[in-house]
Amino acid sequence: MTTSAIAALTPEMIREHGLTPEEFEKIKQLLGGREPTRTELGIFSVMWSEHCSYKSSRVHLKRLPTRSKLVVQGPGENAGIVDIGDGWACAFKIESHNHPSFIEPFQGAATGVGGILRDIFTMGARPVAVMDSLRFGPILTATNAGRDTRATQAEIHKNHSVMEGVVSGVASYGNCFGVPNLGGEVKFELCYSGNPLVNAFALGLVRRDQIFYGRASGVGNPVIYVGSKTGRDGIHGATMASEEFSEGSEAKRPNVQVGDPFLEKLLLEACLEAMQTGVIVGIQDMGAAGLTCSTCEMGARGGTGVEIELDRVPQRETGMTPYEIMLSESQERMLLIAQKGREEEVFRIFQKWGLDAVEIGRVTDDAKMRVLEHGVVVAEIPNAALTDNAPVYKRPLARWEPPVDREMPERIRFAESKDFSSQLKRLLASPNICSKRWVWQQYDHMVQTNTVEAPGAGDAGVIRIKGSNRGLAMALDGNSRWCYLDPRLGAMHAVAEAARKVACAGATPIGATNCLNFGNPEKPHIMWQFSQVIDGITKACEELDTPITGGNVSFYNETLGEGIYPTPVIGVVGILEDVHKTAKMHFAQTGRKIVLLRANEVGDAVDAELEFGSSEYAKEILGAVWGYPPELDLEKEATLQRALVALIQAGLVESAHDCADGGLAVALIESALPAGVGLNIRLPEQKLPFEFLLFGEDASRVVISCDPISLPRIQQIAQEYGVFADVVGETGSDRVEIAVDGNAVISASVAELREAYEGALERALRTEPSVVAAD
């Protein structure tokens, strides 16, 4: 057999495939001096794209901690796996689907969920939970002096549309597939107007001795295509995800995949059933780069080659070329390596589930990907040329200072006569703090009947492990504004807060996954931000013993040269020894003591001024951003988390809520509103403005509540751990009363605070941008 005729490749064709002249020359060298066929050019284009090759990030990702005594599988497979005891393990991962979700919000978000679910069950794990971290541009024009008004009405209208489409897509796919969505986070900043972020997380359970890997082994074993038929949707999706957006990006809708969650549910059941027979040797999802990626990566991992015949590939459109078949990213497809002679067992199982299952090739011993059509070779590439020998760039770094004041602007003045009650209500209604009920009420969070803590009930999502009293807690977190101000410190906070949320459920963090969203890596300051974020994640994960088991990098989140804030999103998973000993977020009843657990001494006024500029209060109420994120002592953070888990597992704590966005005042109100419980809070005098006490976002703090009888024991255990346990008040009545040194500073009914907090997002999305008036 000979390689099919080569059409002339022009510099324009090479450029359109996202390849540089230098990369094209390297391709020719790897092919023994010949030029690639058009099909091979497409294959190199997707496999060498930033999305698939990690060519700009790989040198930095090597610094991440990836090992612990519990890690079964780290980065490099479809998902990471950690041992959770009793013969079980959990597979989990977070990935981005940012670019498709801007072009086609519903399908982009839906297929993002579908893709992460396939990554989980490809490992042999049954998905039991999903979460999502979403970032959008502003959804309101100015409703107070602080809100950024640079977003145009057209941008806000677009942001409404994108958000509604994304949330609907996430809900539709997860609900139809039958996996509970346990929440996540939703944030708004101006930088996401042209670059929304959709980061999907999934977790599944697998028996420790029944894990499957994406490796092609056993020369002569059949290669079997299963699942949906191949169409033209998603062609060059991976390449699109490695480019900036321009004014013509809307024309890229054909690059966005179309998902079918019902078919994916069938695929899940068929795959898990086939795995139980022992016939499956290896399995790989056809995700980014489709058949191309699954073929070459399985061969590379297994040290073998894979030969496939495109005439056998099930197709739903006529006249598809080899180029289109290899680059299609049609959803709900898998590639299996089966034991030779047992093919019929596979066919029967998938036929029972109404799915295509076709032998399209075999495993070879030459470490090459070989693609044939009508018996003619249309692509023949060494696996290493597409994987290990892909370009790796150590791009230049340039330290960058954000264009903000590092010290508090002179125009900012604090006065004790301010109406803090009104400011609190404005803050509760602000997009980043207000209730995201409108989002998570669209998700089915009770399907599978394992959910212990649903969205809005706790800082982390919690599921029980059936057949035992044990459970798993999971949380997502990331503060991009803090990473904008200080990438390293902001990344440390993302890890710490995600782990703290898990600890608030009474679970011990055991592993992490990261989704790293950035602008153009060809810009030195972007790569400096990226490197700093990696350093921050590394430091925090080492200190908190949460190794990174896998994740995703999404570069080129820019539109017309304007990039997003550096946005690392961290997912942390923790083990809960007894699901009956967990803590909700809300105060359950009156007559309970409220305690502020904190790891640190109260800071001085100078530090507080510098750190306050990164708070939600500064942005929303004062209309300014300055300074740095709060300082973070990771050793003390780890101690706080251990103390919190010990208190909850001892049955002493009824509720626990991370003190984060909006500071202490917001944490108290968020804890009070679900059950409609009032508060009587008395804070001691400190040499700080009241704003800092109420709304400062100091690190390593948790608000807990307890029966008064339990208070002495809580204080004793806290002292043993070296953690401060300040009694700040108690629950009662139907009002919130907060005093500082005996001076009333906040007085409001629970009802009016609930109205501000719970209805804000719905009101914003119901309101046309052109009629939103400023106060």
Q: What does each model-identified segment do?
A:
Residues S45-S49, K62, Q351, N517, ...:
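Short amphipathic alpha-helical surface patches that mediate protein-protein
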Residues C52, R58-T111, G115-L117, F121, ...:
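Non-catalytic terminal/interface segments that mediate subunit docking, oligomerization
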Residues A5-H17, E23, G33, R38-L41, ...:
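Glycine-/charge-enriched secondary-structure boundary and capping motifs
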Residues T3-W88:
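N-terminal amphipathic, basic-rich helices that act as targeting or association modules
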Residues T149-A151:
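Short, low-complexity intrinsically disordered segments enriched in A/P/G/S/L with frequent Arg
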Residues T2, A7, E77-A142, E155-L355, ...:
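Mobile "lid/hinge" segments at catalytic clefts and subdomain interfaces of large enzymes
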